[in-house]
Amino acid sequence: MNVLLEMAFLSQTLPDPYEDFIHHHLQYYGYFKAQKSSLPNSGTHQRVWRNSPRYMLNGSFGERDDFISDSLEKEMLLWPTCLSSTGHAHIDAVNRDSLLLSSPLLRTRQLIFDELDEASPRLREPRELFSCFSSRGPLQAPRWPIECEVIKENIHHIEWVPHQPEYFYQPTGSEKVPEIVGEEQGTVVYQLDSVPAEGTYFTSSRIGGKRGTIKELAVTLQGPDDNTLLFESRFESGNLQKAVRVGIYEYELTLRTDLYTDKHTQWFYFRVQNTRKDATYRFTIVNLLKPKSLYAVGMKPLMYSQLDATIYNIGWRREGREIKYYKNNVDDGQQPLYCLTWTTQFPHDQDTCFFAHFYPYTYTDLQCYLLSVANNPIQSQFCKLRALCRSLAGNTVYLLTITNPSRTPQEAAAKKAVVLSARVHPGESNSSWIMNGFLDFILSNSPDAQLLRDIFVFKVIPMLNPDGVIVGNYRCSLAGRDLNRHYKTVLKDSFPCIWYTKNMIKRLLEEREVLLYCDFHGHSRKNNIFLYGCHSNNRKHWLHERVFPLMLSKNAPDKFSFDSCNFKVQKCKEGTGRVVMWRMGIINSYTMESTFGGSTLGSKRDTHFTIEDLKSLGYHVCDTLLDFCDPDQTKYTQCLQELKELLQQEINKKLNNFGQDMDLEGNWSDIPLSDIESSTSGSDSSLSDGPPIRLLNIVADEPNQKTVLKNPKKKRLQTRKQRNEQYQKSYLMRELKLTENAPGRARFVSTLQKQPTFLKSPESPSPSVRRSENPRLNETQLSGREKGTSLDPPLTSPKNKERIQSKKPGFTASCSPKRSTNSSLGPAPDVKPNWSKTRYSATRKDHATMAVYPSLHIYTYP
């Protein structure tokens, strides 16, 4: 019977000559045959694509032999379990309806009717991305740079949650600090031959990486008694470059830097074989770059035993003793390096084990997960999977749109959007596990998940930097740059993942409000989970950006730390996704930082995070989103009130540190919050800013640019303190030069270094007046707070020179005061240096008064 149907199908002639040609031409390529043995669920998704509750025009059924369109009865016989009662009702309605037109002008597969009596059709959605692929393997094999050798092995790890909490290592102070001896006194047992380093740039990629035979890089064992470990890292996310044997059971390890750079060594992931059970091994990583690490306060490395996974179903676990993080004693004139050393014992002889900085989550893991979603007949109805773009290497950057179908166009347009992304930094695999937990929940059939899908449109980019994840980078893409510093880029070809993400959000903002944007990250120097946000100067939304983090801390009190959150917008963070989206109009724009270590809070105090802990945070994000948007605003109002109380306490703490006391009731909210908060301790990626490496090499090849390139680049200061000191020194030099033709300024400069505070004089002219009166005050000198920057003010500011020469010479400058936005109030009067313990005693009638502290500005009104 099937043979007869297929013969009849192949001999079918279509009325349209072009369609008839394409039909007969493509059937030999298997497109119309679609054997069900290789497409286990494709029919289900095509049925969803075709038989979504919509009325379709004649000819809109596909012309594949598993979708026979001669009669609807054949369709129902082929897929009796796929059609719901609603689907049957729609099919009957189509059969009965006289509007099923047969005109050649309306014979199309792309137009559908929302209602039977509706005269205007609409375009149908495109087919599912995975509709023609098997669930037995990933959609697309990863593409590697052509310089990278890749072993032909499938690395897979099981998920496992330890039965007991994994506590931090408690340093004893007597841990051994091995001296680094190197390959001069040791034996190299593993080394990558060709590693793309600084000075080179990405050119092309291919599946499987480098052409040719894969070399055996590990040493050859001399017999069964040879106990040398066999190292390997030429697989997804692996990054071991060299292993040197310096003792019977001691090895020095060198990590490969991010490709095409000489920086960013923190993530590690490698394999060892030929283990011995009763021996104590010591591993020392010798080229880490961060001076501070969670390894110094008890974090342990992760180990995975293949035999334990096979026999006992045990996965990744924390292992390590005698853990020490210290500075490398080798001085090669370059940037200082740091070492991590630990000892361990393997559970089995002749085992295959893996070590990692954190639980790996590879590009293949993501593709398998997304493929399972696409092949799920229920989830695929409200989760649309698309390709946002291709990365530099040609790997797909996936975009998920998750929302329940709306009953009317008006209901669909009223939905707000939520944008979530992860893995812009490839070494921060904890962000992928949080994203995995979020997707598990939002795609589930729980009532809360269904409610969220009813009221929101979720745009999810689960892996922004697939190239970096594949090759084992810690921070950069194949452009050799940190993508989270280039959200303002216009270089679409160099940073496609970021450019298309920003463009997608920009288009989304044009059609609906984006309630929340959150980019998931990992943090290597702080425990717990916390958020970085952006403080808004809009009084209407004052403190509102802090409500969501506070709610999240209440929903996950043993994981999330609100005290670690920061909302200061620093100049060095202007290119991050958080700040760029905030400036595009998304008030609730966040970076979620998840520790590589564990928690110091509540019931999980001093324990490492597991995979389940990170997944649960994804659930808590959904739960908090429901609280945040609850029509009953009781929780929201309570959080706002609590935030005001916390802010008052922080201000009082600042004042106490200055040795002052003050009643702030009624006026404390005028204090700029950016002056209260300290700067974030996020990673410094300034060395990874700038144009892509490829463009720099193109410029270097130009003959007329040689003279420019000979000038050495100005050496960057390593710490913020040094930058501030240099800025203050250069500023003082400019002040001294300004006094040459202005003797009246000499007294100002002489008092500059005496006292740290000054008062605003009522006679001080506005900045625009001063600019016209004194042309020497140029735009550079009048920059700072008046231009909206959030950096801490310098020691003094040129716009305060005239104010210094007040009637009270004891007061000198330390920072520029914040101008009041209330233009109806008069200028602030002079203030005496004696402070009242209750209310500010210098407040005069009919005048606004401002007391100025270093980095703290307070307004009081009568």
Curated annotation (Swiss-Prot):
<dbReference type="InterPro" id="IPR040626">
    <property type="entry name" value="Pepdidase_M14_N"/>
</dbReference>
<dbReference type="GO" id="GO:0008270">
    <property type="term" value="F:zinc ion binding"/>
</dbReference>
<keyword id="KW-0378">Hydrolase</keyword>
<keyword id="KW-0206">Cytoskeleton</keyword>
<feature type="region of interest" description="Disordered">
    <location>
        <begin position="704"/>
        <end position="728"/>
    </location>
</feature>
<dbReference type="InterPro" id="IPR050821">
    <property type="entry name" value="Cytosolic_carboxypeptidase"/>
</dbReference>
<keyword id="KW-0645">Protease</keyword>
<dbReference type="GO" id="GO:0005829">
    <property type="term" value="C:cytosol"/>
</dbReference>
<dbReference type="Pfam" id="PF18027">
    <property type="entry name" value="Pepdidase_M14_N"/>
</dbReference>
<keyword id="KW-0482">Metalloprotease</keyword>
<comment type="similarity">
    <text>Belongs to the peptidase M14 family.</text>
</comment>
<dbReference type="GO" id="GO:0004181">
    <property type="term" value="F:metallocarboxypeptidase activity"/>
</dbReference>
<feature type="binding site">
    <location>
        <position position="521"/>
    </location>
    <ligand>
        <name>Zn(2+)</name>
    </ligand>
</feature>
<protein>
    <recommendedName>
        <fullName>Cytosolic carboxypeptidase 2</fullName>
        <ecNumber>3.4.17.-</ecNumber>
    </recommendedName>
</protein>
<feature type="region of interest" description="Disordered">
    <location>
        <begin position="669"/>
        <end position="692"/>
    </location>
</feature>
<dbReference type="GO" id="GO:0005814">
    <property type="term" value="C:centriole"/>
</dbReference>
<comment type="subunit">
    <text>Interacts with RARRES1, KIF11 and MAPRE1.</text>
</comment>
<feature type="binding site">
    <location>
        <position position="425"/>
    </location>
    <ligand>
        <name>Zn(2+)</name>
    </ligand>
</feature>
<dbReference type="GO" id="GO:0036064">
    <property type="term" value="C:ciliary basal body"/>
</dbReference>
<feature type="compositionally biased region" description="Low complexity">
    <location>
        <begin position="674"/>
        <end position="689"/>
    </location>
</feature>
<comment type="function">
    <text>Metallocarboxypeptidase that mediates deglutamylation of tubulin and non-tubulin target proteins. Catalyzes the removal of polyglutamate side chains present on the gamma-carboxyl group of glutamate residues within the C-terminal tail of tubulin protein. Specifically cleaves tubulin long-side-chains, while it is not able to remove the branching point glutamate. Also catalyzes the removal of polyglutamate residues from the carboxy-terminus of non-tubulin proteins such as MYLK.</text>
</comment>
<keyword id="KW-0862">Zinc</keyword>
<feature type="compositionally biased region" description="Basic residues">
    <location>
        <begin position="711"/>
        <end position="721"/>
    </location>
</feature>
<dbReference type="GO" id="GO:0006508">
    <property type="term" value="P:proteolysis"/>
</dbReference>
<feature type="binding site">
    <location>
        <position position="428"/>
    </location>
    <ligand>
        <name>Zn(2+)</name>
    </ligand>
</feature>
<feature type="domain" description="Peptidase M14">
    <location>
        <begin position="359"/>
        <end position="629"/>
    </location>
</feature>
<feature type="region of interest" description="Disordered">
    <location>
        <begin position="750"/>
        <end position="836"/>
    </location>
</feature>
<keyword id="KW-0479">Metal-binding</keyword>
<dbReference type="InterPro" id="IPR000834">
    <property type="entry name" value="Peptidase_M14"/>
</dbReference>
<keyword id="KW-0121">Carboxypeptidase</keyword>
<keyword id="KW-0963">Cytoplasm</keyword>
<feature type="active site" description="Proton donor/acceptor">
    <location>
        <position position="593"/>
    </location>
</feature>
<feature type="compositionally biased region" description="Polar residues">
    <location>
        <begin position="813"/>
        <end position="825"/>
    </location>
</feature>
<dbReference type="GO" id="GO:0035610">
    <property type="term" value="P:protein side chain deglutamylation"/>
</dbReference>
<keyword id="KW-0966">Cell projection</keyword>
<dbReference type="Pfam" id="PF00246">
    <property type="entry name" value="Peptidase_M14"/>
</dbReference>
